[in-house]
From Swiss-Prot:
Keywords of the record: Ribonucleoprotein, Ribosomal protein
A Pfam family reported for this protein in Swiss-Prot or TrEMBL: Ribosomal_L27
Name the record gives this protein: Large ribosomal subunit protein bL27
Biological source species: Saccharopolyspora erythraea (strain ATCC 11635 / DSM 40517 / JCM 4748 / NBRC 13426 / NCIMB 8594 / NRRL 2338)
Gene transcribed to yield this protein: rpmA
Record region (Disordered): 1-21
Amino acid sequence: MAHKKGASSSRNGRDSNPKYLGVKRFGGQVVKAGEIIVRQRGTKFHPGLNVGRGGDDTLFALSAGTVEFGRTRNRKTVSIVPAEA
């Protein structure tokens, strides 16, 4: 049996907290203004029509409507199709 802990075992044992990233509202879902659509690191999804981007690259709805995922050139985009009044 070893009487010392070993070179690295006492330096291990940490884990970061979960960040809860990902798509929060899927295509076809109805959203209100200000609702978060995607939480992400970097721009995996780019903002489209009626979608804003926060400082941490979070995409959120600027107006009420239906979420729509699509492609523009080689980018994945998220747009909001306004609800017809």
